[in-house]
A protein has these predicted regions:
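A nucleotide-sugar donor-handling region in carbohydrate enzymes
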Residues: 139-204, 208-213
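Conserved nucleotide-sugar phosphate-binding/catalytic loop shared by glycosyltransferases and other
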Residues: 5-9, 27-28, 32-83, 315
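Short amphipathic alpha-helix
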Residues: 15-26, 41-42
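Conserved nucleotide-sugar donor-binding subdomain of glycosyltransferases
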Residues: 69-101, 108-109
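Donor-nucleotide binding loops and adjacent catalytic segments primarily
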Residues: 22-24, 182, 188-265
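A short, glycine/small-residue-rich beta-strand->loop->alpha-helix junction that serves as a flexible
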Residues: 7-19, 213-216
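Conserved donor-nucleotide binding/catalytic region of nucleotide-linked donor-dependent transferases
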Residues: 310, 315-343, 361
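A donor-sugar binding/catalytic signature common to diverse glycosyltransferases
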Residues: 101-106, 123, 255-298
Length: 361
């Protein structure tokens, strides 16, 4: 079978989510042929792995803590032209590649092109419209996002929604699946072996901001605060220099989940894929949503009983030290709450089965 993936190029989370689904499909369909249409981060991520077609996408102007709605629209004022150009590009690709199904992650042009050519489509996205509680804070930005998501939910043959803490279920053509993660913790080596191989004598605090610059102020604050704690910190995927001996700064590496498995706790932004892996691996987390990013506000609303939530805008050395000291006292409580979430199988396994069922109809 042939599978065309149309994936947003914003951030790493969508890349890792779809790669996990692709790997499951390749295990189940040995003759599968994969093609990906994408841009930005995802294009660089997949360029040595699968055949690619370049499309255009939204541009986000990274700042230290927040998404500026005005700057996003200024940067993307001509996106409507890119949107229709993308549809044309994807339609040509569909006619040439002739996929059995089009799988789309957060890029509505893929659904529009598939519908125009009467191709089966599956939309994968974590926006649960039953849990949107922040409309009044985002204005036209929210309107644009919700219109796009509703269009895809309406016109796709099936919709796959990976959960965080919601109950996996089926509602019509919407399939709520387990969190989609890169690899199941049971498939990794045990913590003792990993700690020995990675060179740690005690479980570290893992810091990750997902490859964006939005959390750089947080990272710099942690670098300043680390010397006050008898903890080992790993700052993952950011090119910075440590200011104390208890901080290790690592570039982006493919074995992130090994570091996650041995970690004592995690400090992170509120990206869906990162939170999915944190919850699946049963780790206490101190979470900072990117200001004005609707998706991350939805995410923290879903996990607020299972992690400590704070605010990037208010971060300072003193406020972080107070917050982190309090967090350390509650790590056992948050770990206990994450263990109440009974995930058994990786959501990518479920998603691949749903896609294959749609293809076989």
């Amino acid at each position: 079978m042939k599978y065309l993936f149309v994936i947003t190029g914003v951030g790493l989370g969508h890349c890792t989510r779809e790669e996990s689904i692709i790997n499951e499909i390749l295990e189940k369909d040995k003759d599968a042929k994969i093609h990906i249409a994408t841009y930005g981060t995802a294009y660089n991520y997949f360029k040595k792995k699968f055949p690619l077609t370049l499309i255009s996408g939204l541009e986000f102007v990274d700042t230290k803590t927040k998404v500026s709605t005005f700057r996003v629209f200024k940067q993307n004022f001509n996106y409507i032209f890119k949107y229709f150009k993308n549809i044309k590009t994807i339609k040509k690709l569909i006619e040439k590649f002739n996929p059995d199904v089009v799988i789309v992650d957060a890029q509505p042009e893929g659904i529009a092109a598939a519908k125009a050519l009467n191709k089966k489509s599956v939309f994968v996205y974590n926006m649960d419209l039953n849990h949107i509680h922040y409309k009044k804070h985002f204005g036209f930005y929210t309107y644009f996002i919700l219109k796009s998501v509703k269009f895809c939910y309406k016109n796709a043959n099936k919709v796959i929604i990976p959960v965080l803490t919601q109950t996996p279920r089926i509602e019509g053509k919407k399939y709520y699946v387990n969190p989609i993660i890169r690899d199941h913790p049971a498939r990794l080596k045990d913590e003792f072996t990993l700690m020995k191989e990675l060179g740690f004598e005690r479980r570290p605090i893992l810091v990750t901001i997902g490859g964006s610059k939005f959390g750089m102020r947080l990272v710099k604050t942690i670098l300043q605060a680390a010397k006050y704690y008898d903890e080992q910190f790993i700052i993952f995927g950011v090119n910075v220099k440590p200011l104390s001996n208890n901080v290790i700064c690592l570039p982006f590496k493919n074995n992130f989940l090994e570091y996650l498995k041995i970690s004592k706790a995690v400090i992170t932004l509120a990206g869906h894929s990162t939170l999915s892996e944190i919850l699946f691996y049963k780790k206490p987390a101190l979470v900072f949503p990117i200001t004005n990013l609707l998706e991350q506000y939805q995410n923290i609303n879903l996990i607020k009983q299972h992690a400590m939530i704070s605010n990037l805008d208010d971060i300072s050395l003193i406020s972080f030290r107070n917050l982190f000291t309090n967090f350390l006292k509650k790590t056992e409580e948050y770990e206990r709450k994450t263990r109440e979430l009974k995930y058994i199988v990786n959501g990518s396994f479920q998603a691949a089965n749903i896609i294959l069922q749609e293809v076989s109809k």
